[in-house]
Amino acid sequence: MNYWLFKSEPSTFSFEMLKEKGKAGTQWDGVRNYQARNNMRAMQIGDLGFFYHSNEGLDVVGIVEVCGLAHHDSTTDDPRWECVDVRAVRDVPNPPTLDQIKANEKLSKMVLVNNSRLSVQPVTPDEWKEVCRMGGLVPAP
């Protein structure tokens, strides 16, 4: 299993909105960055990810599961762009903020800390466990 971080502005698409989609989830569409697209192409069904609220909140608020492999993004006619399907798994009880993540020495190499603009990012197993611990998810899912 691999771990990821998905970023979204809560005013555009929040974790609450994803939860409303239920078990079917929804496509993580609108990504127009090659590195983020390639990250989605590497995903497997069952991979887990953090749902991160960007611009407002700046915190890890939920856990998502990849429930559909990379496929054409229906929001564009351009065949270069793909997306995966994700569904909400659970809320993070105590959402770690970006400042808290940056202050944690164990997370100093995390992509979120060093390339915070990338909208879909890999997360290492150790980073996953540490952010889960910070958020009150022990043991980590």
Question: What is the meaning of each model-derived region?
Answer:
Residues 1-43, 138-141:
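Compositionally biased, charged N-terminal/linker segments
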Residues 2, 24-27, 45-47, 60-62, ...:
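A generic structural signal for short beta-strands and their flanking turns/coil linkers
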Residues 11-13, 93, 130:
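Short, acidic Gly/Pro/Ser/Thr-rich loop/turn segments
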Residues 17, 95-101, 131-134:
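Short, charged, solvent-exposed linker or helix-capping segments at domain edges/interfaces
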Residues 40-52:
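Short coil-to-beta transition motif at edge beta-strands of beta-rich domains
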Residues 52-58:
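Short, charged beta-turn/beta-strand-edge "cap" motif at the junction between a beta-strand
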Residues 61-121:
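Aromatic- and Lys/Arg-enriched surface recognition patch
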Residues 123-141:
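Charged phosphate-binding loop/patch that engages nucleotide di/tri-phosphates or the phosphate backbone
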